[in-house]
Amino acid sequence: DAFDFVQDEAEKFVRKNGAGSENRMIVSFSGGKESTATADVVIKALANPKITHLFGNTTLEFPMTIDYAERYRKNHPLAEFRIAKNTDQNFYEVCKEIGPPARMMRWCCSMFKTGPITRVLNRKFGDKQILTFYGIRKNESVSRSKYSRVTENTETVKIQKQTVASPIFEWKDLDVWLYLLSEKVDFNDAYRLGYDRVGCWCCPNNNLRAQFLSRIYMSERSEKWRSFLVDFARQIGKPDAEEYVDSGKWKARQGGNGVAAAGDVK
């Protein structure tokens, strides 16, 4: 049927693009449903349970994601499971210096995700051109719909010296769930709680539904973050700080706005 074709096509894609790259290949593992499905497709297509997985722990992951990553690791004992984490900087301390991240100023990605991941890759592979199997789908967002299924050293590849191949690029949301459930693949419990996407719990790109759920399931973190944002709004002179935060206007910030060090952000 149609889904069998989708699954078979993804496995053929992995075998074709993975040929000759066995010693310089990784699966990018985020703990989300797409990366979980991708990892399973890659392992089965290559019949290689030892493939390296790289998990970027931004320190802002859902607690459920950390639990799931550990569970995944135990369920795949032959896989080399590496963790990239920024242990030098604290998210809140950086926010105090340069202001919280916003949709147009996501400094957190380079500092807490791509930077640590690049360091791990450099330690493992040096100057080798590596192949990364990535769990992105073009239906996830407008920006991702502009990606190519195989991309090499372009601006859309955030970490250089790698070819990014996306086996499930053409899959719809339903295809991902059909795969996970039919193949009996364990997945992140955050989805069972109602989240439709899994990432950083305080990301300015999170929708209202995710924010609502986080107030329920991560109430202490959510309240601490809201208090910080309200204090920040007062610091930069917003007349109604609570309304500025609760309406989501903080996400649209585009410049330093009263934060001296914000000009250092690249």
Located regions from the model:
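Nucleotide-activated chemistry modules centered on ATP-dependent adenylation/adenylyltransferase
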Residues: D1-K266
